[in-house]
Amino acid sequence: MTQPLPESQNGPTITVHPHGELTTYFGRSYGGVPVPIEPGITIAGFLERLGVPSKEVWLVAKNGEQVKRDETLQPGDSLELFAPVAGG
């Protein structure tokens, strides 16, 4: 179930760029989506807080570089989230 994005924009934020089916968790993707973060939160914790199932995220890039989900987020970071792709 999709969790609503937090409404408060008073604290530190990151910009999330969801791709593919992941846009359903963020409402849009064009230009990125500012999302508040808590100090010291990891990418895995951030995704869990928003209700994004781990299996729906294939690749994560922070500030243009592929990273693991145990990476800590900092205010101002840019986070790219890519869904798995299937085709034939």
Kindly give the residue locations of the regions a language model identified.
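Ubiquitin-like/PB1-type beta-grasp interaction modules and other compact soluble beta-rich domains
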Residues: 1-87
